Amino acid sequence: MTKRVLISVSDKAGIVEFAQELKKLGWEIISTGGTKVALDNAGVDTIAIDDVTGFPEMMDGRVKTLHPNIHGGLLARRDLDSHLEAAKDNKIELIDLVVVNLYPFKETILKPDVTYADAVENIDIGGPSMLRSAAKNHASVTVVVDPADYAVVLDELAANGETSYETRQRLAAKVFRHTAAYDALIAEYFTAQVGESKPEKLTLTYDLKQPMRYGENPQQDADFYQKALPTDYSIASAKQLNGKELSFNNIRDADAAIRIIRDFKDSPTVVALKHMNPCGIGQADDIETAWDYAYESDPVSIFGGIVVLNREVDAATAEKMHGVFLEIIIAPSYTDEALAILINKKKNLRILALPFNAQEASEVEAEYTGVVGGLLVQNQDVVKESPADWQVVTKRQPTETEATALEFAWKAIKYVKSNGIIVTNDHMTLGVGPGQTNRVASVRLAIDQAKDRLDGAILASDAFFPFADNVEEIAKAGIKAIIQPGGSVRDQESIEAADKYGLTMVFTGVRHFRH
């Protein structure tokens, strides 16, 4: 009995060669629309889909394969006489292989000038239906959605006259993943179009970007997936220019670093980070000086860290950076001389280019946190705050220099793990106290790290002070200005302590926990 294949593809890469090989093996080819034209033009004989259905393609191609003569040929179980008799009685010929890929919905909605009508028109209906029918009947039917699988199918057909059950099952699983992702993307697009922020069903689709050697620890398996609709300002979109492939921990740290740098748009800024916490942030009129400040913030912790810059790296800055052991450098661009310095002297240094002009787009993405048996979803902590909305709650007002430092520190503190404390001046961090289970311990940690650089320093806290003992510790260290959200039932005790020691304290009214 002659084997039959139905071919209908939007991605025509390799399809002519695949069809030619099938012809050599004696297969009969059914095809549709543009695929049939491409095959006919290449000299591959095909049968038109309407010759099988007895019904013309119509409505601009919207209706062409949704017909019992197609789906009966795909779904008929070869092990059931009743199915085979029904097919025979209704003159339905069996189809043994389906090669289909879908209308380019993703590519369409990524176009900057796409219209809603264009998006709707590129939703494939017949393609997913054929794929699902064939995949459901994988006991008898081979289904191919990815040109990368053409070779393995041809090899098995040439060797054995049919594909193995294991191959058919694997390809069916791939099809169901593919159609599920396709539908999820359509659902995501329509959900956004209607402005639904809390859908009763959450469908997300990601594409495998990089298999990883291991996860957070060597005993953990891991992979890196990228959103099907890529975010421009993200570690997934960065271009790697040098060094080993990124590890699981590299990617998490790099993501944390670029989230921080987004908040420092106006001035050349350098962020150094280790284990998801900033260990140095420097801001200046030029990127070289910003590097100096970030490095001087904590010359010990920066060792083996990640550095992200929001301006092009020049030769002078590269010379300074190459003297420090770093895992990753991320910047919008590098001068040729700077890149040569870094690559020539650091063969394993991971150097990434990530244009900074798209950074605001990444702020609109939701954040997902996995818990056992569930998923937490929240919008990002990117509330637009203005110092004009802050409240000075003490008798003493901040000086102009203190006000600048308080604003700088408030940008930085929301990226420190809670309980988070940071000590800064107006252009660099001096001490970081992250992740302690009581706030006064974080205060002590940050102050101890700042040590002899406390003259003129200020302190920021990601959440309110539950007791006045925090203010007592701060005053004892000689720090004269504090910024915190406020909101404790004991706020007045902290205010009175600040007044007692001549401190100025600002309440922002916005908490910035980070867990």
From Swiss-Prot:
CDD domains tied to this protein: IMPCH
Catalytic activity: (6R)-10-formyltetrahydrofolate + 5-amino-1-(5-phospho-beta-D-ribosyl)imidazole-4-carboxamide = 5-formamido-1-(5-phospho-D-ribosyl)imidazole-4-carboxamide + (6S)-5,6,7,8-tetrahydrofolate; IMP + H2O = 5-formamido-1-(5-phospho-D-ribosyl)imidazole-4-carboxamide
Enzyme nomenclature, EC number: 2.1.2.3, 3.5.4.10
Lineage: superkingdom: Bacteria
Coiled-coil blocks: none
GO cellular component: cytosol
GO biological process terms held by the UniProt record: 'de novo' IMP biosynthetic process
Stored SUPFAM superfamilies: Cytidine deaminase-like, Methylglyoxal synthase-like
The protein's annotated pathway: Purine metabolism; IMP biosynthesis via de novo pathway; 5-formamido-1-(5-phospho-D-ribosyl)imidazole-4-carboxamide from 5-amino-1-(5-phospho-D-ribosyl)imidazole-4-carboxamide (10-formyl THF route): step 1/1; Purine metabolism; IMP biosynthesis via de novo pathway; IMP from 5-formamido-1-(5-phospho-D-ribosyl)imidazole-4-carboxamide: step 1/1
Domain MGS-like: 1-145
Swiss-Prot/TrEMBL keywords: Hydrolase, Multifunctional enzyme, Purine biosynthesis, Transferase
InterPro entries in alphabetical order: AICAR_Tfase_dup_dom_sf, Cytidine_deaminase-like, MGS-like_dom, MGS-like_dom_sf, PurH-like
Pfam family, one: MGS
Protein family membership: Belongs to the PurH family.
Domain notes: The IMP cyclohydrolase activity resides in the N-terminal region.
Name the UniProt record assigns to this protein: Bifunctional purine biosynthesis protein PurH
Record gene name: purH
